[in-house]
Curated annotation (Swiss-Prot):
Keyword field contains Secreted: yes
Name of this protein: Protein Nef
Residue span of region Mediates dimerization, Nef-PTE1 interaction: 108-124
Membrane-spanning residues: none
Residue positions of motif Dileucine internalization motif: 164-165
Family label: Belongs to the lentivirus primate group Nef protein family.
Region described as Acidic: 62-65
Gene it is expressed from: nef
Motif (Diacidic): 174-175
Bilayer topology: Lipid-anchor
Induction: Expressed early in the viral replication cycle.
Stretch list, region Binding to ATP6V1H: 148-180
Domain characteristics, as noted in the entry: The N-terminal domain is composed of the N-myristoyl glycine and of a cluster of positively charged amino acids. It is required for inner plasma membrane targeting of Nef and virion incorporation, and thereby for infectivity. This domain is also involved in binding to TP53. The SH3-binding domain constituted of PxxP motifs mediates binding to several Src family proteins thereby regulating their tyrosine kinase activity. The same motifs also mediates the association with MAPK3, PI3-kinase and TCR-zeta.
Length: 206
């Protein structure tokens, strides 16, 4: 009884079973494609480039040169709470994101790098709408977007070498509220899901 499954196939099963047991749930606030990954272990036909903005964006990036390969080096997976917290602290320790002026292009590069090196599908870095502070929808991500004070903007724009295409010189053109935003680390976001309190409507399907 059991046929061909009885001996040879059972060899790797304990490791697979353990991996399944340890698989963490997707963090609150990730997108539909990540929910697919959580439930099915793959992105299904319900999330394609035709009907999912994150899938369409990713497909477009694969045809563009961004300085590193876009295809993940590791298995594709949804962002988890623990991974978001760990990534936040890693970036804080390494520096470079804190106080950096936000632009969609910079966010895209960060998302692609994380997708390529860690395999996290890039539909997790979303924020509450403005005006004012934008809080991360993904619970565990400890970076919020904070409007830059006018004095700081003036100071940054004083330098003669400031490129007209630098995010600080675009005066919030990327932002629906026309605010210039910067990434700001806030460790409390690991314990307090502000976005869920402010916008419970975004989490109805979580």
């Amino acid at each position: 009884m059991g046929g061909k499954w009885s001996k040879s196939s059972v060899v790797g099963w304990p490791a697979v079973r353990e991996r399944m047991r340890r698989a963490e749930p997707a963090a609150d606030g990730v997108g539909a494609a990540s929910r697919d990954l959580e439930k099915h272990g793959a992105i299904t036909s319900s999330n394609t480039a035709a009907n999912n903005a994150a899938c369409a964006w990713l497909e477009a990036q694969e045809e563009e040169k961004v300085g590193f390969p876009v295809t993940p080096q590791v298995p594709l997976r949804p962002m988890t709470y623990k991974a978001a917290v760990d990534l936040s602290h890693f970036l804080k320790e390494k520096g470079g994101l804190e106080g950096l002026i936000h632009s969609q292009r910079r966010q895209d590069i960060l998302d692609l790098w994380i997708y390529h090196t860690q395999g996290y599908f890039p539909d997790w870095q979303n924020y509450t709408p403005g005006p004012g502070i934008r809080y991360p929808l993904t619970f565990g991500w400890c970076y919020k977007l904070v409007p830059v004070e006018p004095e700081k903007l003036e100071e940054a724009n004083k330098g003669e070498n400031t490129s007209l295409l630098h995010p600080v010189s675009l005066h919030g053109m990327d932002d629906p509220e026309r605010e210039v935003l910067e990434w700001r680390f806030d460790s409390r976001l690991a314990f307090h899901h502000v976005a869920r309190e402010l916008h419970p409507e975004y989490f109805k399907n979580c």
